[in-house]
Design a protein with these regions (language model features):
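Conserved histidine-centered catalytic loops in small-molecule metabolism enzymes
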Residues: 62-100, 122-127, 218-251
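Short, active-site-adjacent cap segments at secondary-structure transitions
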Residues: 22, 79-81, 103-104, 187-189
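Phosphate-handling substructures
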Residues: 23, 88-156, 250-251
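Generic structural signal for well-ordered alpha-helical scaffold segments
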Residues: 46-60, 151, 155-167, 192
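Acidic, low-complexity terminal tails and accessory targeting/binding regions
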Residues: 1-12, 104-118, 163-177, 190-251
Length: 251
């Protein structure tokens, strides 16, 4: 083992989208509205829990296995919190809530049907679309966020959770320490596009992330560096799986 490897610590991160809501079913833009899980979503949570259990117990080499989950960190919006509570294998484990994992605030577009938003709020919709390439451009309306606003808070939250796991020295540098992050589709898509290196071996991976899908990534931390922004690397291993066997969940 060379010196660089000795200083490298790895934490696996499960990237999970919340279960289906009534707003999802109706095609209404949620943003940071605190919406509830619907009946379909409750069934999705049951399947998610079974898939997480399979990842922890299966001996099938084709499954993205995890030894155990050390931390569960979730957006504090109830659709994510309820999903996190329902997927828990160990009921005694604490769930950490964070507003930093919330969906992007899209200003006046929140609560508007996606099909009619371009007609009802043409300027706001145009700004939202333009902001996908102009990362510093905020959505129109009070509270509207830019892509950079979202990336900044999400990165802070996940890297803080990773560092706390490493500081607790739970799994040494074996790569077996795992945390689960329960968040939103918009957050996951931005994370994937801007923060991670991909290692997906050519699998189809573009598109919408379905509810209760699971992605996996590794966060590598160079413990020899004190520069927090330069000593981490995010590597995406799988994206938006609906089941532990790895059926693609991307449209």
């Amino acid at each position: 083992m060379n010196k660089d490897d000795e200083n490298k610590r790895v934490v696996r991160v499960l990237l999970i989208r919340h279960a289906r809501t009534t707003h999802n079913a109706l095609g209404i833009i949620q943003g940071q509205l605190d919406t509830e899980i619907n009946e379909d979503g409750e069934e999705e949570i049951k399947s998610l829990r079974a898939n997480v259990m399979k990842m922890m117990t299966s001996k099938n080499s084709s499954i993205n296995r995890v030894k155990n989950i050390r931390k569960v960190v979730t957006s504090d919006l109830q659709r994510c919190l309820h999903t996190a509570q329902g997927m828990m294998i160990d009921a005694s484990q604490m769930i950490e809530e964070s507003s930093k994992l919330r969906e992007r605030h899209v200003g006046v577009l929140q609560g508007c049907p996606r099909k009619t938003a371009p007609m009802e709020f043409p300027r706001a919709w145009a700004t939202f679309c333009e902001s996908k390439t102009k990362r510093g451009l905020r959505c129109a309306g009070e509270g509207g966020e830019s892509v950079d606003d979202v990336l900044r808070r999400v990165r802070e939250c996940i890297e803080d959770a990773v560092r706390r796991v490493l500081e607790e020295d739970l799994e040494e540098s074996s790569g077996d320490a795992t945390i689960a992050v329960v968040t939103h589709a918009g957050v996951l898509l931005l994370l994937r596009e801007y923060l991670v290196d991909e290692d997906l071996s050519g699998e189809k991976n573009r598109g919408i992330v379905r509810n209760c899908s699971i992605g996996t990534m590794r966060v590598e931390v160079d413990t020899s560096s004190s520069e927090s922004k330069s000593n981490t690397r995010w590597i995406l291993d799988s994206w938006g799986k609906v089941d532990a066997e790895g059926t693609a969940d991307v449209l």
